[in-house]
A protein has these predicted regions:
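Extracellular interdomain linkers/hinges and stalk-like, low-complexity segments
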Residues: 31-79, 117, 126-140
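C-terminal motif of bacterial Sec signal peptides marking the signal peptidase cleavage site
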Residues: 19-22
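Extracellular/luminal low-complexity segments enriched in Ser/Thr/Pro
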Residues: 104-114
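Periplasmic c-type cytochrome electron-transfer domains
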Residues: 3, 24-25, 32-45, 138-486
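Low-complexity "stalk/linker" and mucin-like segments enriched in Ser/Thr/Pro/Ala/Gly
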Residues: 52, 83-106
Length: 486
């Protein structure tokens, strides 16, 4: 439309028009001129905003080779229901060195990389729609993985899980177990998931894998404050650790709780241009081009068919298998045969003092309220007072999901934005630097609304850090079934 609304004229009946033109009197007087019809009235039809029609498709080019394409012609088509002529704008994210002239994108990738192309179509009334695609110059794909003749044991049935992880009502871990009934971890399914998790084919550039941001030696977290994905743009948040992720309640995936399952999280990571950047159809095609994936899918799902749904299910099974239960804390405090161990007799005096501080639920401000043991995870989200004012609202009002404390000594940097480089900085925050705000979690406020702080002596700070280090699971992190097979 060329205006915000269109007026539909009202057509008057002929009899009414005749009555309006009838003579006003007798004699020789001339009849009056007909009265003009009333102004056209009718229903107001609102402007129809442009819409995107079609699915995203991406463009592959060669490293070192010049290319040029019309972004509007290549992108998913933007249509206007009113037939308005649209004005287009093309914006690039990533891949410095490429150029935009009008709607034409051109340039040369000097190394493997990718760029996100956003096309916005705007009608004369200012309504718009945006479509996007990715131009990628991929690296050569990796070779075949080295796999054992017999799959590793991943399913719960083959693991020596402590009682707390199997049937404890006190710690409620089974009640928090988010394995979907139709996709419980199997040995063959997680074996396929392990290959997918470490395969750089999962990125549009063949340069990144899930394991690039979730590194085994760092507790399946990242040592970087903000990782960069396929298009080379830093992500907005620190990558969270995946260990014991299956014990997060439904709805608690990502720091802002925005997705409902591991599969949803994997789909987002695979397809967002700022992460791995693929489309699921393109990913299916890449895996079909290999010789080794079909047998793995056959073993996992009963047929060699490679589908996006199966890719997501296998990744979910592998992440579900990332269970930490062999730390020094577990050896000291697990319940075995229904009998709880004496933690104090198995931890050092300093570590036991730290455990007491951590678990003392008689205090209003206890670590265990947000970081349950033994899983180290929690379902809650909270504003933990790192800022009095915030720009990242998280799940709302500056609230974020607490991280698992499993392997916490290895998962630095800390917080959703990676602002703290060491455990001591985290302890100091809760000790004396919790910031007051109207959104501060109630567990961190006293009855007057003031921030509650630990105010620990130095010896207790050291003890708390020593206890947190007992949650490192070296056995899990060195287990070959979680290693990179490529």
């Amino acid at each position: 439309m060329s205006s915000a609304a269109r007026i539909v004229p009202t057509v008057l009946p002929a009899s009414l028009l005749m009555a309006l033109s009838a003579c006003g009197g007798g004699g020789n007087t001339s009849p009056p001129s007909p009265a003009p019809p009333p102004a056209a009235t009718g229903p107001v039809i609102p402007n129809g905003a442009p819409q995107v029609a079609g699915e995203r498709r991406d463009k592959r080019v060669l490293v070192g080779e010049y290319f040029s394409l019309d972004a509007v012609a290549f992108a998913p088509r933007i249509v206007d229901p009113d037939g308005d002529v649209l004005r287009y704008q093309v914006v690039l994210r990533g891949a410095p060195g490429l150029a935009v002239a009008g709607t034409q994108v051109s340039g040369v990738f000097s190394t493997a990389g990718a760029v996100e192309v956003r096309v916005t179509g705007t009608d004369p009334d200012g309504a718009s729609a945006e479509s996007l695609f990715v131009i990628a110059a991929p690296a050569a794909p990796p070779g075949a993985p080295a796999l054992p003749a017999t799959p590793f044991l991943y399913a719960d049935e083959g693991l020596a899980l402590p009682d707390d992880f199997r049937n404890s009502s006190e710690f409620r871990i089974p009640l928090w177990d988010t394995q979907p009934p139709g996709n419980r971890t199997t040995d063959a399914g997680a074996a396929l998931g392990r290959v997918l998790f470490h395969d750089r084919r999962l990125s549009i550039t063949n340069t990144l894998a899930c394991a690039s941001c979730h590194q085994r030696e760092h507790g399946f977290a990242s040592p970087e404050r903000f990782n960069t994905g396929a298009i080379g743009v830093p992500l907005a948040r620190n990558a969270m650790a995946l260990v014991n992720a299956r014990y997060n309640a439904h709805g608690s995936w990502f720091a802002d709780l925005r997705v409902l399952s591991i599969q949803d999280a994997a789909r987002e990571a695979l397809t967002k241009p700022e992460e791995l950047g693929n489309t699921l159809p393109d990913l299916e095609a890449k895996l079909l081009a290999t010789s080794f994936y079909a047998p793995l899918f056959d073993a996992a799902f009963g047929s060699p068919e490679i589908t996006a749904g199966r890719i997501l299910r296998a990744l979910e099974q592998y992440v579900q298998a990332l269970i930490s239960y062999r730390s020094r804390y577990d050896a000291a405090c697990d319940t075995v045969g229904g009998v709880a161990k004496d933690c104090a007799a198995r931890l050092t005096q300093q570590e036991e003092r730290g455990r007491q501080i951590f678990t003392d639920s008689s205090t209003h401000f206890a670590c265990v309220h947000c970081h349950s043991l033994p899983s180290g995870s929690n379902v809650w989200f909270a504003n933990n007072g790192i800022d009095a004012q915030f720009t990242d609202v998280g799940a709302g009002h500056g609230q974020f999901r607490p991280a698992s404390l499993r392997n916490i000594a290895l998962t630095a940097p800390y917080m959703h934005d990676g602002r703290f480089a060491t455990l001591r900085e985290v302890i100091d925050h809760y000790d004396h630097d919790v910031r007051a705000s109207a959104d501060l979690d109630p567990l961190l406020r006293d009855s007057n609304g003031n921030p509650v702080r630990l105010d620990l002596p130095e010896s207790d700070k050291l003890a708390l850090e020593a206890f947190l280090r007992t949650l490192t699971d070296h056995a899990m992190l060195s287990d070959p079934k979680f290693s990179d097979p490529f």
